[in-house]
């Protein structure tokens, strides 16, 4: 179910503050965050945000096509490990 249009998009306060501060100073630096639930807003375009995937922070460059999506959508938490090619038993 999508968020109601009456409400504003969720963005963590610490993340919003850091982005506004960098926009005022016109600087670009990597912003480290654990907030995967934050929505990408237009003021984030052009910044690089390192999003936590449970193990490490993945740097993601924010573009205009990402606006409206959540940060967590761009940092996958699971990695699929393939079965060995010669292991017939586990591939059944």
From Swiss-Prot:
One of its GO terms (biological process) is translation. Keywords: Chloroplast, Plastid, Ribonucleoprotein, Ribosomal protein, RNA-binding, rRNA-binding. One of its GO terms (cellular component) is mitochondrial small ribosomal subunit. Pfam families: Ribosomal_S19. It is found in: Plastid, Chloroplast. It comes from the Eukaryota. One of its GO terms (molecular function) is structural constituent of ribosome. InterPro entries: Ribosomal_uS19, Ribosomal_uS19_bac-type, Ribosomal_uS19_CS, Ribosomal_uS19_SF. Belongs to the universal ribosomal protein uS19 family. PANTHER family: RIBOSOMAL PROTEIN S19P FAMILY MEMBER, SMALL RIBOSOMAL SUBUNIT PROTEIN US19M. NCBIfam families: rpsS_bact. Protein S19 forms a complex with S13 that binds strongly to the 16S ribosomal RNA. This is Small ribosomal subunit protein uS19c. The gene is rps19.
């Amino acid at each position: 179910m999508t968020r109601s249009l009456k409400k504003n998009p969720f963005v963590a306060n610490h993340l919003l503050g850091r982005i506004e501060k960098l926009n005022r100073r016109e600087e670009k630096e990597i912003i480290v965050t654990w907030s995967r639930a934050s929505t990408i807003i237009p003021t984030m375009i052009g910044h690089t945000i390192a999003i936590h995937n449970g193990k490490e922070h993945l740097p993601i460059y924010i573009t205009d096509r990402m606006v409206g999506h959540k940060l967590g959508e761009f940092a996958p938490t699971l990695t699929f490990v393939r079965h060995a090619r010669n292991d017939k038993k586990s591939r059944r």
